Amino acid sequence: MALRKARELRRLNDPSIKDGIHIILMDGIFYLDEPVFIRPEDSGTPESPTIIEAEFNAKPILNGGVQINGWKKYEGNIHGLKAGTVWVADAPKKAGKIIDYRQLWVNGKKAIRAKSTSGTKMERILSWDKNSETCWIPFKDKSIVFQPGMEMFIVQWWAIANLRIKDIMVKGDSAKVSFLQPESRIQSEHPWPAPWISKNNGNSAFFLNNGMSMLNEPGEWYLNHDNGKIYYYPRAGEDINSVKVMAPVLENLLEIKGNADFPVKHISIKGISFEYANWLRPSQNGHVPLQAGMYLLDAYKLKIPGTPDKASLENQAWVGRPRAAVEVNFASNLKFEACSFQHLASTGLDLNKGTNHNTIIGNLFKDIGGTAINVGVFSDESFEAHLPYNPKDERDVCSNEVITDNLITNVANEDWGTVGIAAGFVKNITIAHNEISDVSYTGISLGWGWTPSSSVMRNNKITANKIHHYAKHLHDVAGIYTLSSQPNSSIEENYIDNVYHSPYAHDPYLWLYLYTDEGSSFFSVKNNWIPVEKILKNNNGPGNVWEHNSPYVDEAIKKNAGIRNPYKYLENEVVIDKSWQLQELPENAVIELVGTDFDMAAIAKLVKSFRIINQGFYQWENHLVIYGKMNSVEKLKNRLALLCPQAEVKSYQNPVYNFTKFERCENSKPAQEWDDFILTANLVADEKLQQAYLDHHKTQFQKWPEVAQGFCNANFQQLQVFKNGRQLMLVISVPKGASLDELNPKTTENNPRVIEWNALMKKYQTGIEGTKPNETWVFFNKLDPN
């Protein structure tokens, strides 16, 4: 009613509103029967804005849910549980019909829809038959009984799918699962992303859910539409007499909607909480996303690849957009400040189409099933997803949006393929000083279309964001991810760290800090703090500039990233799941194969799958060496041994000596790119001398500091010594293009202690088998495996 009153004051041009209209919300929960609707007639002006805000120190909540009361202990038999273990209540109704929902919150904590696996565990599919649109799964637990409404939740590359089950046919310890339309056809016809079968990394992970027969763990719930009851297995410490159980009802809590000719303007919303929003499309049509939660309406593989825009394209896709708690279309000069978006089934805030010059600042986005903030058109439902977007009326384009100083945490917890902030075909957007944590997939995704062709996208800036604890469930992921051509766009001075380890990932090594994907063009990617150079430039277009993205950038970048005052209080809400493992950072290592007749193409293909950073292949005589920063060194070594059974395969890890210029040389910055030179020798057979060699290297920085200074003088970026048995591997890294022959003499220039050190080392070293008499260190030649 306050909005209507304000609207009338505007219509009558009442003099009392010349300085603006303030609509003040008092403390408390406002349960909504329908979304709040703001339209062009509610617009303010620059001189007389409309401000909807919380009273001082108040916390008004716009609540789209319903509280479920009347809980009793269920005295029936469920899975042999003691009577009274499970609670039961009458399911809430509206107009005589049971309200449907896919989420439930108990005392503000999301409960778990009853599922087939325990805790965070998932099973692996056995096979997928696209022709029959069926899937075989392990089915040892015969207590699970099929009933209508059951679903399969499946991981497929960078997305998930929710598939409504049509039937389960049990055969021994396996079962064939069929699905309802339309998702059954879409799931089996679309090529990307799809279920995978992998001997090395395991098949697609899945669980079944939404069945009474799976209600067997604390925190799980089930809504029975047949008898109108809801069942809940309480967690420890929950009191049946005081518990607050909330179910979402409305899919949308606030809609701000104008049109191209009459947009909504000059409205501020401050200090308002938006809580408990629903999203039911997965229950009605299934949910098979293409990427970033944009669900497929139709998709299939092209029999003959290629489109006018992309000759290699092999698939076609048309997508829809998930609902949001707050949806904005055709609006400008709006401001969302110090608001809270929590306990939401799908997207938090969506600036969908035709929005410009809006500000999203200092807000909390927490416990959200989908993306926290969506901005811009991705693809209209009638527009194929791989085409560049160039509307005739550029007023449709979202532009000049500012998204700063927001905390986004514990999001993408229903649709694991959604992200922290997703921007589609946008221009002149600024995403800065946000903190993003506890995300199932990517932190910030910018762009759409998978094409280097020109579109409306340009002048987009991602600056000084703090992104950490992401990739919780899915891989092919990054802290910051881009698509397509975006002239004059930049990714600069962000701080990205701490990547979750996903036990379900199709590719355990495809996690990244920065990822410019298909068609990404004309980006400046500079001065981002990342702990290791784990980045990917996949099928990029022209004009990208990469500079100084490493742990060696100015420490001030790390300190300045993230939320600023006066919004730093939001940091108290940061979620980090300490029960979840983190990725181990890849470390420099050497793998050596000794043999002949190597199949270099097969070796290169295997090594590529391990995503080694700065990998190089080197050879001396019958010795082949792989060097770079890698995870799972022993796993790669074993795989190489299987591939090359006639070869001796050795690994070299944990260097016995490690000089790095950044740590040892005063006022130094490492070169942006390096060349690595690899040499090998043996230690002498005398074990006492071997130990003396190691002892000298352990104390070299203290007792022989001139040696490290010599390396500084020569501009060595890094010098590492690895050991396996008696054999040593020496790696010397210099600025790319520099000559080691020219740099090496500078180590001894005016530095007699280095000459003494080199003479001392000679008594500990000898050549490996195959070297010439009096030959000690031998150089490997770098190879091009292609």
Regions found by a protein language model. Give the residues of each.
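Extracellular polysaccharide-degrading/modifying enzymes targeting complex plant/algal/animal polysaccharides
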Residues: 1-330, 335, 381-392
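Extracellular beta-strand solenoid repeats
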Residues: 24, 31, 37, 51-53, ...
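Short glycine/acidic-rich loop motifs that flank beta-strands on beta-rich extracellular proteins
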Residues: 34-35, 251, 278-284, 323, ...
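Extracellular beta-rich repeat passengers
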Residues: 117-118, 280, 504-578
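Right-handed parallel beta-helix
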Residues: 265-276, 312, 332-343, 355-370, ...
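Short glycine-/aliphatic-rich beta-strand segments at the starts of folded cytosolic domains
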Residues: 579-596, 675-692
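Short amphipathic alpha-helical segments
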Residues: 595-610, 689-715
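An amphipathic, aromatic/His-enriched active-site/gating alpha helix that lines ligand/cofactor pockets
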Residues: 611-616, 629-656, 714, 734-777
